[in-house]
């Protein structure tokens, strides 16, 4: 329920790997460690949701299925100087150089997911880019977290400074009201907010495409449960 802080990355490691946003626990790295070692980051669940200094990382990879398009494609940003430095033999298919040299068409590409990702990025650009969507995502998350903190029936599960803007995880304090709450949000047309099976509770995913109006519907149902 929190992001570790104050740690040092040993200088003799080959690389440091982190995941910028944890979808299961609802934590998100707001700052990244300074290190001279090779930095690798999985940004699958918050890529293009906020501004990031890409130059700080040697490799960034992200599955498309959260903020870019349908599942089946992966975006990779890699610095030229780290290519070919595996120090061991790896399968041709797993070598980034293979895909770079073939313009990402070493094998038959999944055309539809790539096409939809293009449309999504065009939509984001026309919206005003990452800076604009970052503000919109912050507004959505702030609204929902404010209700979680205000409403005595609900409780956040993550340290406030580490709360994710993409995956808002929370608990219902009164288990006797669980059926009533589930009925409310189901009737309101909300789906998929049950928490991950390993942690339970609830999880509202606020990815780029989620409009603020939908977040407000969930908040209204939380208030309605309180009134009942």
Label the model's feature ranges.
Residues 1-47:
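Active-site phosphate-binding strand-loop segment of PLP-dependent enzymes
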Residues 187, 196, 200-228:
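PLP-dependent enzyme catalytic core of the Aspartate aminotransferase-like
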Residues 64-145, 159, 228:
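Active-site C-terminal subdomain of aminotransferase-like
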Residues 40, 54-65:
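Conserved active-site segment immediately N-terminal to the catalytic lysine
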Residues 2-5, 26-31, 49-55, 71-74, ...:
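A short secondary-structure junction signal
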Residues 154-184:
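Conserved PLP-binding catalytic core of the aspartate aminotransferase-like
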Residues 153-157, 189-195:
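A short linear hydrophobic-aromatic micro-motif
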Residues 78, 170-174, 206-208:
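Short beta-strand-to-loop capping motifs
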């Amino acid at each position: 329920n929190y992001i570790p802080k104050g740690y040092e990355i040993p200088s003799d490691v080959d690389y440091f790997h982190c995941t910028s946003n944890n979808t299961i626990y609802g934590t998100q790295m707001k700052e990244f460690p300074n290190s001279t070692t090779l930095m690798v980051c999985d940004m699958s669940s918050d890529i293009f949701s906020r501004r990031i200094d890409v130059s700080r990382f040697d490799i960034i990879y992200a599955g498309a299925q959260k903020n870019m398009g349908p599942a089946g494609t992966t975006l990779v940003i890699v610095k030229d100087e780290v290519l070919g430095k595996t120090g061991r033999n790896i399968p041709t298919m797993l070598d980034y150089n293979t895909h770079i040299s073939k313009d990402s068409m070493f094998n038959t590409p999944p055309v539809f997911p790539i096409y939809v990702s293009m449309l999504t990025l065009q939509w984001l650009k026309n919206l005003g880019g990452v800076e604009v969507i970052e503000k919109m995502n912050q507004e959505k998350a702030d609204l929902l977290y404010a209700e979680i903190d205000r409403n005595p029936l609900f409780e956040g599960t993550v340290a406030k400074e580490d709360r994710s803007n993409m995956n808002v995880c929370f608990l219902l304090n009164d288990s006797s009201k669980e059926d009533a709450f589930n009925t409310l949000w189901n009737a309101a047309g909300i789906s998929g907010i049950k928490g991950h099976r390993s942690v339970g509770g609830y999880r509202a995913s606020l990815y780029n495409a989620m409009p603020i109006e939908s977040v407000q519907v969930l908040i209204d149902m939380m208030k309605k449960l309180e009134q009942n």
